[in-house]
């Protein structure tokens, strides 16, 4: 993204771009920013082709058409499949494309061995838009809120992300709902978030931990696959599982110290109704089992980061291990 921002800022563009990846919000944002920077509102010299049935001859004929009273012609090609299958003549064309021509390819997935991919890499610039880490998302949400003249604390932003997951389009929608809901309030609070924001991730994580604790393995795995379908990254799921087990351990220890529900809620900074849920989950594990699980989670994370274990498989193995009867 750094180089794309520089190209746009300095008005120094590559002739061809490939933007792809799982974070579609960023994919489309940079498509639109590049389009505006390269050609502005010129509709005469702009063409867009979309879908798997694009006529390559028609596309190249358009590409060979000189721009009308302008220096540039821009063609955007979306979801073509050109980067996963053989496309006659396109790679060669890209390598020798006319100077007036600019092309932006938008794809969800690519094969880096593909000839068209290699041609774009050599001639232009390729940018993969991955799901952003929490640190980036937190700053982004803070910026969105600040732009509206409001404030929000870091814990409140994290609480929002726990509900929404990492998809930026979903986060943006929920922030906009919050802005409307809290129209006269200077600060967005966790209570506001609980009141208005749609919970997609947190409830499924909670239900998954409950299924694990009750040894309902199929249910736990089904919930995990649901989270993957929501495009929640496996390592973030592991982070949330770890956090839930940490909370279970703290609740269990406070119960042993004879803290009541209200005192536990105050001590841990959580809602009272959550205490009972954590108590019920923790009943199915000894404190030492939870500590051992937390160590195993850390080992699994290290195995993924060092390339010894696939991230999806790592979380699946955790679920199977701790939901076994």
Describe the residue ranges of each PLM region.
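Conserved beta/loop motifs at nucleotide-recognition and modification sites
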Residues: 1-325
């Amino acid at each position: 993204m750094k180089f794309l921002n520089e190209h746009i800022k300095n008005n120094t563009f590559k002739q061809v771009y490939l933007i792809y990846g799982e974070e579609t919000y960023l994919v489309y944002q940079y498509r639109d920013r590049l389009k505006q920077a390269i050609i502005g509102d010129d509709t005469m010299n702009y063409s867009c082709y979309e879908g798997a049935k694009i006529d390559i001859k028609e596309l190249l004929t358009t590409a060979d058409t000189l721009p009308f009273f302008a220096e540039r012609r821009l063609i955007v090609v979306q979801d073509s499949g050109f980067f996963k299958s053989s496309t006659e003549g396109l790679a060669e064309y890209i390598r020798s494309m006319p100077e007036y021509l600019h092309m932006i390819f938008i794809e969800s997935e690519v094969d880096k061995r593909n000839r068209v991919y290699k041609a774009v890499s050599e001639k232009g610039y390729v940018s993969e838009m991955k799901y952003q880490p929490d640190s980036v998302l937190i700053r982004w949400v803070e910026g969105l809120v600040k732009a509206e003249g409001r404030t929000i604390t870091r814990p409140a932003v994290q609480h929002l992300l726990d509900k929404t997951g990492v998809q930026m389009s979903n986060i943006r929608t929920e922030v906009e709902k919050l802005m409307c809901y809290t129209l006269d309030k200077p600060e967005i609070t966790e209570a506001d978030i609980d009141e208005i924001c749609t919970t997609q991730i947190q409830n499924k994580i909670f239900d998954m931990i409950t299924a694990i604790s009750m040894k309902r393995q199929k249910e736990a795995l089904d919930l995990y696959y649901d989270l993957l379908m929501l495009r929640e990254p496996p390592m973030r799921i592991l982070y949330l599982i770890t956090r839930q087990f940490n909370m279970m351990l703290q609740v269990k220890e406070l119960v042993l110290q004879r803290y009541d529900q209200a005192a536990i809620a105050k001590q841990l900074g959580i809602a009272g109704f959550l205490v009972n849920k954590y108590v019920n989950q923790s009943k199915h594990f000894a404190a030492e089992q939870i500590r051992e699980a937390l160590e195993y989670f850390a080992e699994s994370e290290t195995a993924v980061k060092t390339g010894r274990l696939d991230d999806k498989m790592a979380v699946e193995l955790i679920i199977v291990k701790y939901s076994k009867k």
